[in-house]
C-alpha cells in the first residue's frame, strides 16, 4: 500500500487505519474516499452505484413487508388501529382494503397479502442489488449505453429526470385508478361515520386545484393541507400525474436551456443536494398533512388530530351537561365568555372554553351540527346522534399528545388512554427526518458549489502536525 500521508491528492481525506481490508476500485487509494464515505466511492462506477441503489430499495421494501406482517400479527380487531401503535395498516385501510362502515376492520387478509408481496419484491431487489454490486459490470457506459451516463452530460441528466417524472406520474395515476375503478378508498366523510366508496365525480377545475396552492398556510386557510374532500384529492392526483408525465416527456425530448446550463451546478453531488432538498420539502409537508388533515389521514385509523380531540372534549361535556339540564346556549364560563358556546372573531357560533383556539376544525362527526352561522343551537338540542357522541368521547380520550411516559390525551382528562398516537409518531418522524435531509441538502450543495468553483473549503491539511509524523504502518 502506498503511504497516503504524502499524496497531496488525498490531503483533504481522512485516512484508513487498515488499508488491507479494502477492495480495488472501492478503496481509498483508487477512489479518494474511505470506506465510511459509502457511495462516494462509486461516483464514477455507474454499475456499482446501480447495485447500491437497487440494494437500498430492497432494504426499504423489506422493511415495509416485514413491518407490515409484524403489524398484522399483532393486530387486535377489537381495538382501534391508533391504540395499537400501527403506522402501516392505517395506510392500507385508508386505501379501502379490509375495512367497512365506520372504519371497522372486517378482513385482515389483504394486509397479509401486502406484506408478503413486499417481502417477495424485496428478495428480487436484494438479488439485483447484490448482482450489480458484486458481479455485474462496474460501468454501464460500454455495454449498456442507454443505462450509462456521465454526471456532466446535461442532456442525459435531464433525460433521466424525465424518466423519473414519468414514473412519479404513473404512481399518482395508480391512486386515481384505485379510488375511481378498483374498489374505491375510505372516505371519512361518508354519511353515518365513514365508509369505502368509489370516487367518481373528480374535481378537475384548475381554479379549485391550484387555488389550494395560493391559499395562506396559516389559520383556517391551511394551504394544501386544508383539503377536506376526496374528490379534490383524487382530482389533484390527476393534475399532478398529468403534469409529471408531460414534464417527463418534455425533459426527455429537450436539452437544457442556456440559462439552466449556467445557473445550475452539473455534478453528482449537486444532483444529490437537489434531491435531498426536494425530500426535505416532502417531509415537512407530510408532517403538516398527517398532523392536521383528517381526510387524507382519517381519524378512524390514525386517531384524532390535536384540534379534533380538543373540540371533541368540549362537545362531550356539552352533551353531558345539556342532559343534566344546563342551558348550553347561555351558560357563562369563568371568564365571562360562553361556557359551552361563544362567537368566533367573525361571528360564527363555536365551542367555548380553551378549545376556542381550534374553532376552524372540520370533522365528519361535527359538521352535521353546523348551520350557515356556525354551530346550530337547535341541532345541538335535537339532532345529536349516538354515533357522534360515541366518536367524540373516544377522540376526547385519545388526543395525539403522548408524553415521554406515553400518557396520551389531554393532561387534565382523567379518562385519557395510555398510548402515543400514530399522528405523533408520523408527524415527529417526518419533521425530524425532513430537517436532517435539509441539513444534508445544505451540506452537499455547499460542497458541490465549492467544487464547481474550483476550491474545496475545509481544514487546511498542508500544515497539519500529523503530516510530519511516522505513518502508522
Swiss-Prot record:
Cofactor note: Binds multiple chlorophylls and provides some of the ligands for the Ca-4Mn-5O cluster of the oxygen-evolving complex. It may also provide a ligand for a Cl- that is required for oxygen evolution. PSII binds additional chlorophylls, carotenoids and specific lipids.
Database matches in Pfam families: PSII
Proregion span(s): 1-14
N-acetylthreonine PTM sites in chain numbering: 15
Keyword annotations: Acetylation, Chlorophyll, Chloroplast, Chromophore, Manganese, Membrane, Metal-binding, Phosphoprotein, Photosynthesis, Photosystem II, Plastid, Thylakoid, Transmembrane, Transmembrane helix
Transmembrane segments: 69-93, 134-155, 178-200, 255-275, 291-312, 447-471
Modified residues (Phosphothreonine): 15
Mode of membrane association: Multi-pass membrane protein
Residues engaged in binding [CaMn4O5] cluster: 367
GO biological process, any: photosynthetic electron transport in photosystem II
Function recorded in the entry: One of the components of the core complex of photosystem II (PSII). It binds chlorophyll and helps catalyze the primary light-induced photochemical processes of PSII. PSII is a light-driven water:plastoquinone oxidoreductase, using light energy to abstract electrons from H(2)O, generating O(2) and a proton gradient subsequently used for ATP formation.
HAMAP family: PSII_PsbC_CP43
Descriptive protein name: Photosystem II CP43 reaction center protein
UniProt organism field: Cicer arietinum
